[in-house]
């Protein structure tokens, strides 16, 4: 039977259509996915992300451990509260998960990992943490609400006390701060400003209701997916998995190659892949009628006249742009156009960088 977050009752009261999402009953939408999408782009919406897993790591060798566990380098994290995004790789360079890591003190870091990968992540982290003497605490006592949109921070701040408002004042993106019983982070999965707020389970429902009363619209998984796709953000299991290199998933920027003597899991395999080349992730735009869908083939002819085929990893209709967009993993050598087979029609698509909307504006 699927698990319920502490906000399950609030979703039903708000009229949500609930679906099983990787073993969790989660809201798909509250009536109109399109309306929810636009609300986040133009005002403020919120998502229950309590199904994600918060993992606290403590011990004198925590930084050393994370420099080995992750492809990105936590040596960059020197200011308390600063976060970074990283892949956690296997020995062959495949992505076990993508996650966010927060630094608080030398002996206290926090990870936020995906729900679909929870059990394998915890097993992998525990296995590799043992030699470093790390104390691992899974924070199942916390719920998490993502408040996103151009007015999200202002609307959320109306619920903060003076100390909390002071704690987040001027906080840059990718920071988190514990302020009273709220952990408030300037992170998100929509391409908009906002907060991801972790708080005790027993306080989550009241906080959610107060946000609703403050004019923040509840949003479901449907809008979350179209928003993240417009923003060019990867979804684990689609853009990457344990068989796909971060180099083939537009995650090359998350690999810290320097210092050259840092040994991290998957480094050797990545160095070979970097030398020989991998597929790459691109954006596709189709302004003609129709919708680009996951797993459709993408065909193109390179400059030498050779034919190649890739695959759409995520595709949808973009509510912000009014036409279809997709992320696709393709061989190198793709030009500015390609062909996607939709049923029995060959549809021309424009090849772009894998990002379509930033701060509510088209970039593709």
Swiss-Prot record:
It is an enzyme of class 2 (transferase). Transmembrane segments: none annotated. One of its GO terms (molecular function) is aminomethyltransferase activity. Coiled coil: none annotated. Gene3D superfamilies: Aminomethyltransferase beta-barrel domains, Aminomethyltransferase fragment, Probable tRNA modification gtpase trme, domain 1. Its EC number is 2.1.2.10. It comes from the Bacteria. Keywords: Aminotransferase, Transferase. InterPro entries: GCS_T, GCS_T_bac, GCST_C, GCV_T_N, GcvT/YgfZ/DmdA, GcvT/YgfZ_C, TrmE/GcvT_dom1. It holds the Pfam family GCV_T_C. One of its GO terms (cellular component) is glycine cleavage complex. It catalyses: N(6)-[(R)-S(8)-aminomethyldihydrolipoyl]-L-lysyl-[protein] + (6S)-5,6,7,8-tetrahydrofolate = N(6)-[(R)-dihydrolipoyl]-L-lysyl-[protein] + (6R)-5,10-methylene-5,6,7,8-tetrahydrofolate + NH4(+). The glycine cleavage system is composed of four proteins: P, T, L and H. Belongs to the GcvT family. This is Aminomethyltransferase. It comes from Escherichia coli O157:H7.
């Amino acid at each position: 039977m699927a698990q319920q977050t502490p906000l399950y009752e609030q979703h039903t009261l708000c009229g949500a259509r609930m679906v099983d999402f990787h073993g969790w009953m989660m809201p798909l939408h509250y009536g109109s996915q399109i309306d929810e999408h636009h609300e986040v782009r133009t005002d403020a919406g919120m998502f229950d992300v309590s199904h994600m897993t918060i993992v606290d790591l403590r011990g004198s060798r925590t930084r050393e451990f994370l420099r080995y566990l992750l492809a990105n380098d936590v040596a960059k994290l020197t200011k308390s509260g600063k976060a970074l995004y990283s892949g956690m790789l296997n020995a062959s360079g495949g992505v076990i998960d993508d996650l966010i890591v927060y630094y608080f003190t030398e002996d206290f870091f926090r990870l936020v990992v995906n729900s679909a990968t929870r059990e394998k992540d915890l097993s992998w982290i525990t296995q590799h943490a043992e030699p470093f003497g790390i104390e691992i605490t899974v924070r199942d006592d916390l719920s998490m609400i993502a408040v996103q949109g151009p007015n999200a921070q202002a609307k959320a701040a109306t619920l903060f006390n003076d100390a909390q408002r002071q704690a987040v004042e001027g906080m840059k993106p990718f920071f988190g701060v514990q302020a009273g019983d709220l952990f408030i982070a300037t992170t998100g999965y929509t391409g908009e400003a906002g907060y991801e707020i972790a708080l005790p389970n027993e306080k989550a429902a009241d906080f959610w209701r107060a946000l609703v009363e403050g004019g923040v619209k509840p949003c479901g998984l449907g809008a979350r997916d179209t928003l993240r796709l417009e923003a060019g953000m990867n979804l684990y299991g689609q853009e990457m998995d344990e068989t796909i290199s971060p180099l083939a998933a537009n995650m090359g920027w998350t690999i810290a190659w320097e210092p050259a003597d840092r040994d991290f899991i998957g480094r050797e395999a990545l160095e070979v892949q970097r030398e020989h080349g991998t597929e790459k992730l691109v954006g596709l735009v189709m302004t003609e009628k129709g919708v680009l869908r996951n797993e459709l083939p993408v065909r193109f002819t390179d400059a030498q006249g050779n034919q190649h085929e890739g695959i759409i990893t995520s595709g949808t209709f973009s509510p912000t742009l009014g036409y279809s967009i997709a992320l696709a993993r393709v061989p190198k050598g793709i030009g500015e156009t390609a062909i996607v087979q939709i049923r029995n029609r060959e549809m021309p698509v424009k090849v772009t960088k894998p990002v379509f909307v930033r701060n509510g504006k088209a970039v593709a």
